[in-house]
Amino acid sequence: GFMKYIGPLIPHAVKAISDLI
């Protein structure tokens, strides 16, 4: 997931979902 690079600014739930993208 590309969201991981943005950092802890994003809730874990969103990071988990972005991991599927």
Curated annotation (Swiss-Prot):
| Highest taxon listed in the record's lineage | Eukaryota
| Biological process, per Gene Ontology | defense response to bacterium; defense response to fungus; killing of cells of another organism
Q: Which GO terms describe its cellular component?
A: extracellular region
Q: Major place of localization?
A: secreted
Please tell me, according to the UniProt entry, what happens when changing D19K. No change in antibacterial activity against E.coli, 2-fold increase in antibacterial activity against S.aureus, 2-fold increase in antimicrobial activity against C.albicans, little increase in hemolytic activity
| Tissue expression from the record | Expressed by the skin dorsal glands.
Q: Give residues where Isoleucine amide occurs.
A: I21
Keywords, A to Z? Amidation, Antibiotic, Antimicrobial, Cytolysis, Fungicide, Hemolysis, Secreted
Which compartments is it annotated to reside in? Answer: Secreted
- Sum up the protein's function in the record's words: Shows broad-spectrum antimicrobial activity against the Gram-negative bacterium E.coli (MIC=6.25 uM), K.pneumoniae (MIC=25 uM), E.cloacae (MIC=6.25 uM), P.aeruginosa (MIC=25 uM), the Gram-positive bacterium S.aureus (MIC=6.25 uM), S.epidermidis (MIC=6.25 uM), E.faecalis (MIC=12.5 uM), and the fungus C.albicans (MIC=100 uM). Has no antimicrobial effect against P.mirabilis (MIC>100 uM). Has relatively high cytolytic and hemolytic activities. Its alpha-helix has considerable amphipathic character.
What remark does the entry add?
This peptide was also synthesized without its N-terminal amidation. This modification decreases its antimicrobial and hemolytic activities.
Name of the protein in its database record: Kassinatuerin-1
Organism the protein comes from: Kassina senegalensis
Taxonomic lineage is:
Eukaryota, Metazoa, Chordata, Craniata, Vertebrata
